[in-house]
């Protein structure tokens, strides 16, 4: 049996890199013929992920990393105001270096009869320009979408709409009927780039999806049955492999800026709280609020009477990761810390999200609705209240609340940097609602958590889907049997 190598090209950033590496680990666990090479595109902005990748490389001998050299001509930082366009151009600037690396991998394997052969290129959403490299080298390409099947349905629909009528989306436009999404979708919950006049980058990305040999999606059949069934009946869509939940159960590794003392303080406080009594507030690696909004959150929490754990982070200059608050008294209402901190609540900076969601004291999650966070909350049976920020989070929030009934709706169309301030009374209602002990949402989420765990086990839907993907890459018809 020939050994084979899969080359992954993830976008830089935790939301893309972490699930990519977890999926790579799943593949090598399933088949000892497979090894993985990760082409590591360096982030334009500082990150804390280097220790995470080093730990993976040290613990998994069949996963290796090759750093892609930084290009000399990079898009200016000001373009980050349109993240989709910025990242697309930044990734495109890496194509020559990536082509050189993969060419060397292919030629070295061809010159040795017992070496590992390159069997496929697996690219991220923002890396679809690398499909051209795969075509030039006659290597099959696959898309690994770290988001969900509903988002895939949306992206597949974009080029079709654009061909009929050049897209210029306004939030007040009529709802769209999108194959794969049950309810008509209002433009106010579209990804931000589509409603701020910069949608060309998204359309360009989406137009490449159908050129791949297959699309791997971080979801599972039981969660998104409608969309996945539709994909399987459309011959114009490449085979779709729902392989999720692909989540990192040890998220502390991915964020080395969290020191052990901070983690211990959080977990010790949770250990002292009653079961399912704490609402957790966390808004992702790029989520933050101005001081005016922070005060309203604090007042809403206090009015709710609920115990809370709040990961509070403040805005930083454009394109940089939000920072922990250096002086809580400056941004919180007078006397708030004295009345709540350590008693009814705990405020921290970066937090070990997976460990918190897994804790028996956690009963609800006020979240930005990033897809990784949604999967983690479902896995642990913790219901969400929606407060989306950026990327496709508004669409995620809409579908979780309106289509799937697995989240409580606070806001669906909030956008990071918005001048709109969510008031304390609205936050109070959202917190009280998500903490309701016997709500239908909680029951649905807990049941879906059980289905998620079954899906990834032997005999489960995602386990089978991973097997089909492996068979397509290295099976009878691949030339690598």
UniProtKB/Swiss-Prot annotation:
GO molecular function: UDP-glucosyltransferase activity
UniProt KW Transferase keyword: yes
CDD domains: GT1_Gtf-like (cd03784)
Keyword Glycosyltransferase set for record: yes
Enzyme Commission (EC) number: 2.4.1.-
Keywords of this entry: Glycosyltransferase, Transferase
Residue spans crossing the bilayer: none
Binding site for UDP-alpha-D-glucose: 285, 350-351, 368-376, 390-393
Reported pH dependence: Optimum pH is 6.25.
Thermal dependence: Optimum temperature is 25 degrees Celsius.
InterPro entries noted in UniProt: UDP-glycosyltransf_plant, UDP_glucos_trans, UDP_glycos_trans_CS
Its biological purpose: Glycosyltransferase that possesses chalcone and flavonol 2'-O-glycosyltransferase activity. Converts phloretin to phlorizin (phloretin 2'-O-glucoside), a potent antioxidant. Possesses glycosyltransferase activity toward quercetin, isoliquiritigenin, butein and caffeic acid.
Family per record: Belongs to the UDP-glycosyltransferase family.
Protein name in the entry: UDP-glycosyltransferase 71K2
């Amino acid at each position: 049996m020939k050994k084979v190598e899969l080359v992954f090209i993830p976008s830089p950033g935790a939301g893309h890199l972490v699930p990519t590496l977890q999926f790579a680990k799943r593949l090598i666990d399933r088949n000892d013929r497979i090894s993985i090479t990760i082409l590591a595109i360096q982030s334009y902005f500082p990150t804390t992920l280097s220790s995470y990748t080093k730990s993976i490389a040290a613990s998994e001998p069949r996963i290796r990393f090759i750093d892609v050299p930084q290009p000399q001509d990079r898009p200016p930082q000001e373009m980050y105001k349109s993240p989709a366009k910025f990242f697309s151009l930044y990734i495109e600037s890496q194509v020559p270096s990536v082509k050189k690396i993969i060419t060397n991998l292919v030629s070295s394997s061809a010159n040795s009869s017992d070496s590992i052969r390159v069997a496929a290129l697996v690219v991220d959403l923002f890396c679809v320009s690398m499909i051209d490299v795969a075509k030039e080298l006659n290597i099959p390409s696959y898309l690994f979408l770290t988001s969900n099947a509903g988002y895939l349905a949306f992206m597949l629909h974009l080029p079709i709409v654009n061909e009929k009528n050049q897209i210029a989306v306004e939030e007040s436009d009529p709802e769209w009927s999108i194959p794969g999404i049950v309810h008509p979708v209002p433009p106010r919950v579209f990804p931000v780039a589509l409603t701020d006049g910069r949608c060309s980058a998204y359309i360009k990305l989406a137009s490449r999806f159908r050129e791949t040999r297959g699309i791997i999606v971080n979801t599972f059949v039981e969660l998104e049955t409608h969309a996945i069934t539709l994909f399987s009946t459309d011959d114009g869509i490449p085979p779709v492999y729902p392989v999720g939940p692909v989540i990192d159960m040890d998220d502390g590794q991915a964020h080395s800026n969290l020191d052990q003392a901070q983690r211990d303080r959080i977990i010790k406080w949770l250990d002292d709280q009653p079961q399912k009594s704490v609402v957790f507030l966390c808004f992702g690696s790029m989520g933050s609020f101005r001081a005016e909004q922070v005060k309203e959150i604090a007042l809403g929490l206090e009015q709710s009477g609920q115990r809370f754990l709040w990961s509070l982070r403040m805005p930083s200059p454009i394109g940089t990761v939000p920072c922990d608050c250096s002086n809580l008294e400056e941004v919180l209402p007078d006397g708030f810390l004295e009345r709540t901190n350590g008693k009814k609540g705990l405020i921290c900076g970066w937090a070990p999200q997976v460990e918190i969601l897994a804790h028996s004291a956690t009963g609800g999650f006020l979240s930005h609705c990033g897809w990784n966070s949604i999967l983690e909350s479902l896995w642990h049976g913790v219901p969400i209240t929606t407060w989306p920020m950026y990327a496709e989070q508004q669409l995620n929030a809409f579908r979780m609340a309106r289509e799937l009934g697995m989240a409580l709706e606070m806001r669906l169309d909030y956008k990071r940097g918005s001048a709109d301030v969510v008031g304390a009374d609205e936050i109070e209602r959202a917190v009280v609602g998500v903490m309701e002990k016997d709500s239908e949402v909680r029951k649905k989420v807990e049941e879906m958590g059980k289905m998620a765990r079954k899906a990834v086990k032997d005999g489960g839907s995602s386990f089978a889907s991973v097997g089909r993907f492996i068979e397509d890459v290295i099976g009878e018809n691949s030339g690598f049997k």
